[in-house]
């Protein structure tokens, strides 16, 4: 069956669920890419043994970390339809009373299941805009989109490694920055970008790959402290798909030219190498014509952004019950409870809104991020508001 994320067992469970909802077999066969013979085998196995038929033959455990079993999720949905006015706490209690053998999910998990199935009534008057995420834009105006990357490390003459951080303007090809750094550590990148924002203003969006420090594999939605800072400044984030550097093709072509002109051979020291980068920047922007620009030079088209950098703007949450500052260790402190949220939001204000008894919604700026419940202190992420979830929580 198709799908490179879900296992075969997941696909069969989805197939059976939709069959039970009354969808036609022919349409399901076509969508799942299976024959009618295979289709009827799956249905017959279900009729003989129920969902356990798939569980028994699967090598996957019934319950995985951070993954609610399919059967439990379906029970929650079924209970909600039986008791449409009940919220997560009452449904959870019903689960505990009538299905005592089931590992009881947290209230926030129950609420997230209801939300995922469209069974949570949304309050009016609240709009949740979304970033383009991995939907890549093709913008024509200077500073609408910057492209960033590290031009792979290379060794200098003194055996020290150099990590060039490069930034280009997408529309004009203007090479805004090529800064030789000692590492890809976040602190150094912060310093470079703050200086760029002061000198050139703020872009509309920044496109990057999924590497450090632009993303963080273990953080909520793959965000990093750097990308959270960009969001606070009103800068959108775009990410190319993993293993698809051609999606940042203009930037990659510049890297080829940069490598040929400045690293063969490399300079002896980092300062001397930076001199080579500066010479290249001037030539690339002011002397070298570009065929894609009708033989114009990037400097002929580029101008600094009208959006000035003035530090982090204030953020407020008028539609929420509380505003709290995430601690340096990534916690939300509420009524004596310490909820581990994410360290990438350390020092930033988030909005909290109570949606059920003991269940709270966490929002960052205009983005709803997660639920947590006070009883278990467990956080349940919502659907990624920045696009397809490239990196897990």
Predicted regions, residues:
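C-terminal, beta-rich DNA-binding module of retroviral/retroelements integrases
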Residues: 281, 285-393
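Mobile genetic element proteins and their domesticated derivatives, centered on retroelements
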Residues: 15, 29, 39-42, 50, ...
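Charged alpha-helix within mobile-element recombinases
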Residues: 226-310, 351, 355-358
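Acidic/histidine-rich, metal-coordinating catalytic segments
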Residues: 197-220, 241-243, 248, 294-298
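Short, Lys/Arg-enriched anionic-surface-contact patches
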Residues: 1-14, 62-70
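Mobile-element integrase/transposase regions
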Residues: 70, 112-168, 172-175, 182, ...
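Short, amphipathic alpha-helical "recognition" segments used to contact nucleic acids or chromatin
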Residues: 7-23, 73-82
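Basic, flexible linker segments flanking DNA-binding modules
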Residues: 51-147, 153, 224, 297-307
């Amino acid at each position: 069956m198709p799908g490179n994320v879900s296992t075969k067992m997941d696909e069969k469970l989805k197939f059976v669920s939709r069959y039970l909802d009354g969808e036609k077999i022919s349409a399901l066969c076509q969508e799942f890419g299976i024959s009618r013979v295979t289709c009827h085998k799956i249905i017959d196995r279900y009729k003989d043994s129920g969902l356990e038929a798939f569980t028994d033959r699967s090598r996957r455990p019934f319950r995985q970390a951070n993954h609610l079993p399919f059967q439990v999720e379906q029970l929650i949905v079924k209970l909600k339809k039986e008791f449409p006015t009940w919220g997560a706490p009452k449904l959870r209690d019903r689960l505990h009373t009538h299905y005592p053998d089931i590992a009881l999910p947290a209230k926030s998990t129950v609420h997230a299941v209801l939300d995922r199935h469209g069974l949570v009534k949304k309050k009016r008057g609240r709009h949740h805009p979304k970033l383009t995420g991995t939907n890549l834009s093709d913008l024509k105006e200077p500073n609408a989109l910057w492209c960033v990357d590290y031009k792979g490390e290379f060794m200098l003459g003194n055996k020290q490694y150099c990590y060039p951080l490069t930034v280009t303007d997408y529309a004009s090809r203007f090479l805004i920055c090529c800064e030789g750094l000692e590492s890809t550590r976040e602190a150094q990148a912060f310093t470079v970008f703050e200086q760029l924002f002061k000198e050139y203003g703020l872009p509309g969006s920044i496109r990057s790959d999924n590497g450090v420090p632009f993303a963080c594999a273990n953080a909520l939605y793959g965000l990093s402290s750097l990308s959270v800072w960009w969001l606070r400044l009103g800068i959108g984030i775009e990410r190319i798909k993993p293993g698809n550097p051609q999606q940042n093709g203009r930037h990659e072509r510049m890297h080829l030219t940069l490598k040929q002109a400045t690293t063969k051979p490399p300079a002896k020291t980092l300062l001397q190498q930076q001199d080579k980068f500066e010479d290249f920047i001037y030539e690339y922007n002011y002397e070298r014509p570009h065929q894609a620009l009708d033989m114009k030079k990037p400097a002929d088209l580029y101008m600094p952004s009208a959006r000035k950098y003035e530090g982090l703007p204030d953020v407020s949450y008028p539609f929420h019950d509380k505003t709290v500052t995430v601690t340096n260790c990534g916690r939300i402190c509420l009524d004596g409870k310490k909820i581990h949220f994410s360290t990438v939001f350390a020092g930033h204000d988030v909005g909290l809104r109570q949606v059920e008894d003991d269940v709270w919604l966490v929002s960052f700026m205009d983005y709803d991020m997660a639920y947590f419940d006070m009883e278990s202190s467990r956080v349940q992420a919502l659907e990624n508001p920045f696009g397809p979830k490239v990196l897990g929580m």
